[in-house]
């Protein structure tokens, strides 16, 4: 299956990438504030509502600060994280995301992607 990988930013001021394959769009980390996140997606012709899932690698703000903005615009978004990362991030959120928990080091699947 073919895929496209777009790096929106990678630095101490924010990390964010998009993986697209077979009509599925997964954001890898959401390390930008809402307006920057939206502008970065718009450059790809996308909006927050077009995302199917986000995978948060860890709880540092340069990897997850935009999660609340994503969830405001896409409440059904699936959020992948390991249990400890989810626990730490949940404390800062006003809503409860659709957490998809995985064990670090294991393989998991989402819409045919592993």
PLM features per residue range, with description:
Residues 16-17, 58-60, 108-112:
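Short, solvent-exposed polar/charged micro-motifs at secondary-structure junctions
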